[in-house]
Amino acid sequence: MLYPTPIAKLIDSYSKLPGIGIKTATRLAFYTIGMEDDVVNEFAKNLLAAKRDLSYCSICGNLTDQDPCAICQDSTRDQSTILIVEDSRDVTALENIQEYHGLYHVLHGLISPMNGIGPDDINLKTLLTRLMENEVTEVIVATNATADGEATSMYISRVLKPAGIKVTRLARGLAVGSDIEYADEVTLLRAIENRTEL
């Protein structure tokens, strides 16, 4: 069906979001059009502010509104342990269990040979710099239990083992193919507590 240009453009914009198909995008567009002007203006303002005011921490790569992020600035955290995750949503999921008290490192992706993504295409160089400059004794790899997650964890283990850094992996309370951000808090807690050395 042909919609007026402004609605068609809004549908197109919504459909570019992950997990949003044309039907959902259409529903969202029409819902947005029916909202009060002040609500739409606040939504637009918040969207623009988030895009403008958020950046990645220069130390760990986590999404933040300050640099360095609050976690990297927190001197009470265990400076000898770094937990490596794929993206900032994983940091949030792990922070919600309130059991891990070390630092994080966000890769912004995984090594994926099938998709042409190698170690230089993700945030690994800053991790290696951090490890050389700080007294880190353990790195916990918390990538998803997928082929790319496994490839990434094995690469990290191969690179760090010669440096004498203990490299561990989250325990397998997480099902193969599952995403950390969707795991419940008890599963994540058990995975951290029962991590295994690589």
Curated annotation (Swiss-Prot):
Residues 80-175 form the Toprim domain. Belongs to the RecR family. The keyword Transcription regulation does not apply. NCBIfam families: recR. This is Recombination protein RecR. Pfam families: RecR_C, RecR_HhH, RecR_ZnF, Toprim_4. GO terms for molecular function: DNA binding; zinc ion binding. A zinc finger (C4-type) spans 57-72. PANTHER family: RECOMBINATION PROTEIN RECR. The lineage of its organism: Bacteria, Bacillati, Bacillota, Bacilli, Lactobacillales. Keywords: DNA damage, DNA recombination, DNA repair, Metal-binding, Zinc, Zinc-finger. The keyword DNA damage applies. One of its GO terms (biological process) is DNA repair. It comes from the Bacteria. PROSITE patterns: RECR, TOPRIM. May play a role in DNA repair. It seems to be involved in an RecBC-independent recombinational process of DNA repair. It may act with RecF and RecO.
